[in-house]
Amino acid sequence: MRLGISALLFNLDKALELCREVDRINHIEVGIDNLDECIKLSKYKGEFDKLNLSLGIHLPMELNSCENIKYIRKSWIDFINKFEDGLKDLNIEYFNMHL
């Protein structure tokens, strides 16, 4: 079983410090909102690997996968696909979004 914590990019260093201190933490979910943040998050790959952390991504709160307007709903899917491509080197376990 995995025990995880969540973080945003601005406090990821502090979250990783906690992961180093508490061996039981083996998962981290990082909230990112913009595609350019994929590059910033990718710089932490070595640290994730070193700590043997699985990784999940919390997508922007504004996402609505049940959007009634088809064009907008499809744009969210395209957005998620771009996130996945931008993070392909990180072995993301899942993407999390709220309805």
Report the location of each language-model feature.
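Active-site groove signature of glycoside hydrolases
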Residues: 83-84, 88-99
